[in-house]
Amino acid sequence: MRWIGVLVTALVLSACAANPPANTTSPTAGQSLDCTKPATIVQQLVCHDRQLTSLDHRLSTAYQQALAHRRSAALEAAQSSWTMLRDACAQDTDPRTCVQEAYQTRLVQLAIADPATATPPVLTYRCPTQDGPLTAQFYNQFDPKTAVLNWKGDQVIVFVELSGSGARYGRQGIEYWEHQGEVRLDFHGATFVCRTS
């Protein structure tokens, strides 16, 4: 699962690139899938799953809105890279969850890049020295509620999860659980505890 995190990081960095290669974009990268003839296993999965189809339509709309406000080669290249990332979910041990998180992540990336989105404060946690700094921003206005974590220079987007107590966020390979001033984290098997104050 760690490769998914690396690909997501690469996607975010490519979106910020000043001059991406001119031939990296696809004219259909932002369009909803054509479910009359899905071309890949992942496209078949999306077309036969109501929730994934809804996410596909939401992403198409969000991407077209982003293009209308700030068309750029970097935005188009990031969307094409995201399409490859989504399609790579066919190799994941849990393709459906991988695809769902890919769509949710891209929706969040586009929303955060929108100047109209309110930017929440950055929270800094006290962690053991060897575990390095951890910061978080919570976008409670998103659906689902989202946290953007930064740990040792890596940014990851996690989504709210059901919790009996405290605040829990996660995605494949990553867990964040805050309870009574203590934050327990698991980043692809690296577990540690930080404090909120």
Swiss-Prot record:
Membrane disposition: Lipid-anchor
Pfam family, one: LprI
Main localization, broad class: membrane
Post-translational modification note: Glycosylated; alpha-D-mannosidase treatment decreases its apparent molecular weight. Glycosylation probably helps target protein to the cell surface; mutation of predicted glycosylation sites (Thr-24, Thr-28 and/or Thr-117) makes protein partially inaccesible to externally added trypsin. May also be glycosylated on other residues. Glycosylation is probably not necessary for inhibition of lysozyme.
Deleted gene: phenotype: Probably essential, it cannot be deleted.
Keywords in alphabetical order: Cell membrane, Cell wall, Glycoprotein, Lipoprotein, Membrane, Palmitate, Secreted, Signal
Leader peptide range in chain numbering: 1-15
Lipidation (N-palmitoyl cysteine): C16
Induction / repression: Constitutively expressed, increases in stationary phase (at protein level). mRNA levels rise nearly 50-fold during mouse macrophage infection. Part of the glbN-lprI operon.
Cellular component, GO, one term: extracellular region
Lipid sites, type S-diacylglycerol cysteine: C16
Location(s), subcellular: Cell membrane; Secreted, Cell wall; Cell surface
PANTHER family: LIPOPROTEIN LPRI
Family designation: In the C-terminal section; belongs to the MliC family.
Function: Strongly binds and inhibits lysozyme, may help bacteria survive in lysozyme-producing host cells. When overexpressed in M.tuberculosis or M.smegmatis increases resistance to hen egg white lysozyme. M.smegmatis overexpressing LprI survive better during intracellular infection of peritoneal and monocyte-derived macrophages, both of which produce lysozyme during infection; M.smegmatis does not encode this protein. Somewhat better survival is seen in human cell lines when M.smegmatis cells express both proteins from this operon, i.e. GlbN (HbN) and LprI.
Oligomeric and partner information: Homodimer.
Protein's name in the database: Lipoprotein LprI
Highest classification ranks of the organism: Bacteria, Bacillati, Actinomycetota, Actinomycetes, Mycobacteriales
Gene label: lprI
